[in-house]
C-alpha cells in the first residue's frame, strides 16, 4: 500500500512539474532575452511615428559650430529630460490600457482526497484507485460593466498623458528659448565691452603720443588707464556670465557639456514681428488646459468605475469528480459533476471608501481644471501687456536713446581730440555710451523673451477630438 501511495504521489508531482516547468523556465529567462509584449499601434500613422521615435544619442554641437534658435528647439524636443519623461508616461499609459483590457483568467484546480493508507487504495491502474480525484475550473465574471469602464478610464488617462506631453513640450521649448536669448544677451554684452576696450586702447596710444608732445597732463592719462581697467574687469565678469548662461542653455536643451566653444547666432526677432491674436477658442485649446480637461475626463471615468465596485462580482465554477468503488471501499460515487456560484457578501463594507476617494479625486481634478483655465487666461493678458511694453522700450532705445548717446560720445571724442574739452567729459560720454549700448542689448533681449513667451502661451493642442471633461456629469 505505501508503494502504491508513493506512486500516486509521484504521479501528482510529475503533473505539477509539467505545469510548473515552463513557467519556471520562463521566469528564469533573462529579461533582456524575452521579447516585450508589443503594443500594436492604432493605425499605420502611429506605427510610422513610433519608428521615427527611435532614441538618438544626445550630443552637444561640434566645437566651434554656430548654434541657432531652430537647432536649440530641435535639441530640446529630442533631448530635454522632462519631455522624455512625459513621453515615457504616454508609453506607460498605453501599457495601462492593455492591462485594463485584460479580463480575469480562469483558475484550474486539481485535487486528490480520501486517501486512506490503512484501508489502501485498491488494485489496478491509477484510474481504478479508490481515491477521490477532482478537476475544477473557476471563472470570475465582472458585473456592472466593470471591464468596459476600466478600459474607458485607462484610455482617458492615456489621452490625458498625451495632452500632458504637448503641454510639457510647449513649456520646455519655451524655457530653452528663454535660455537662448539670455545667453545671446550676455554674448552681445561681451561684444559691446570688447568694442569699448578697443576704443580705450586707441585712446591710450593717442594719449601717450600727446603726453610726449606735452598736450595732455599725466593725470589725464592715468584717469584714462583707470577707466580702461574698470572696463576690463566688467568684460571679465561679462564673459563669466556668458559661460554660465550657455551652461544653463545646454541644461535646458538636455545636451551634455556647457557649449563653451559654440557661438550663438543672433536670431533676434524683428521689431515689427507679427504678433498672433488670441481668438475665442485659443484659451480652450491650450495644451495645459486640454491636459487638465483630459485629466478631469479620466477622473470622471475612474469615478464611474469606483461606483461600479459597489456591485459584487460573481465567480462560477464547474467540477468533475472521479471516485471509483472497490472491495475495500463501497462509498465511491463513480463519475460526478457539479457547478458552483460564489458571490461575496457585502456585510462589512460595500467598497464605499474606494467610491468616496474617486469622488474626491474627481472634484480635485475639477478644481485643478478651473485653476489652470484661470491662470492661462491671466497669463495671456499679462504676457500681452509685457510684450507691448518691451516693444515700446526697444523702439525708443533704438530710435531715440542710442542715437543720442552715440552723437554725444562722438562729439566728446572730437572735442577731446582737438583739446576743447577735458578728459572727465570724455570719460562721462564714454560711460554713458557704454551703458546705453548695454541697455539696448538688454532691451533687445527682453523683447525677444517677451515675444517668445507670448507665442508659447498661445500654442494650441494638436490633438483632434480632445475629451471635454466639463461635460462630465457631477
Sequence positions of predicted segments:
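Acidic, low-complexity, intrinsically disordered peripheral segments
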Residues: 1-7, 12-13, 24-46, 439-474
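Short, charged, amphipathic alpha-helical segments
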Residues: 151-155, 218-227, 423-431
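Bacterial Sec-pathway N-terminal export signals of envelope proteins
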Residues: 26-112, 131, 140-141, 149, ...
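Hydrophobic, lipid-facing positions within transmembrane beta-strands of outer-membrane proteins
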Residues: 131-137, 335-341
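Periplasmic alpha-helical coiled-coil/stalk elements that build and connect Gram-negative outer-membrane
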Residues: 168-285, 386, 390, 450
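Amphipathic alpha-helical coiled-coil segments
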Residues: 85-100, 168, 172-195, 202, ...
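Small/polar (Gly/Ser/Thr/Ala-rich) solvent-exposed segments
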Residues: 84, 107-128, 141-167, 187-189, ...
